[in-house]
């Protein structure tokens, strides 16, 4: 739909290819092809939407190098918040509440088992660098923890080239509510309406509703 409705559409290559190292490579995070498109179109600004390339600090840096305005966070902000372990520690240092977690990566299966026992099942296994619901698995019991670790690590490596994971307590019955903040280069800041995104499949949002029912 977006390609059909666009004034111009640029082919970035095959949508998805398997690399020799087992990683999955997708065209929209190919910085070389994206640079070609930015140069060819003489783009003045780039807004890549949400998720994936929109959360790559390297793409924001590419835009800076080309003199293209990147509509999104700075590379420094992305690096501070793009790593889930680093962002949790940052939130804790500011006195903000976070979902109970192990406090450190799950470096081994034995370490993960110890952490999960302290947190209490069920737990979530999450890739520290994962986005878009990738690299996330549930572990209901100690018996399902090894497969959850293996699955989360494998998926995170395939998509992001990172296999570091950590454990977090699973909160059943919780709701997923987003609040986005929009700011400009002149100090203007706006908090956008909250959005309900609890309807998900495989940890990926299916429906977003605003305003949030019940709030």
Cite the ranges covered by each PLM segment:
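N-terminal beta-alpha lobe that positions the nucleotide/phosphoryl donor
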Residues: 1-215
